[in-house]
Amino acid sequence: NMNHRRKIKICINGRRVLLLSILCLFGFCLVAQVQPRRNATQPAKSKVYLLHADVLKKSKDNPDPNAQILVGDVEFRHDSIYMYCDSACFYEKTNSLEAFNNVRMLQGDTLALYGDYLFYDGNTQIAQVRNNVRMENRTTTLTTDSLNYDRVANLGYFFDGGTLMDEENVLTSDWGEYSPATKMSVFNYEVKLVNPQFTLTSDTLRYNTATKIASIVGPSDIDSEDSHIYSELGFY
């Protein structure tokens, strides 16, 4: 069906290996971590700067005596990314911070990341965003409750269920990643793609939000109003 092909093309074009790291604990909040794939070269370290806070104080209740407690219209900058929140703990010695409530990370006009909680490590350049998370990259939006964003790899990845939406399709899965630079996304476990013309279910799917091409790499079912197709390899 030509209308179907305009909406999405399904092909097999290469293999992808997905790696999940061992779960670990990090920071003052116990959150599950998934390490991204990185090149061997580590990022050059640069300083996280506090740009503004209505109130700055020390707190005896914080387990880190060097923590700066910030309240009201808090703003940080790290290289080209700006971070905003209602309150924060700034750990200047370790070049890291925790941000609470109304959290925003903005990088130019290409990337916006929102959530209720953020732990950001300026040395590794990894942001851990939790609860009501939304990543926006032009016409693509990724929503989840647990997302890590690796600034070096330019990769956002979720591991507790998520949804990616663009102009034509809605994709959901238990685990996934999205690259704002390449527009490529990878979905694993309980994958579902909903298009106005059909619904695709699979266990693994690759999807490019720029080209609207989906690559299936395993057993998949494609259902439309008048047909059902099962495919492991092939085109639709």
Feature roles, as predicted:
Residues 1-37:
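Bacterial Sec-dependent N-terminal signal peptides
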Residues 33-236:
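N-terminal amphipathic/hydrophobic interface segments
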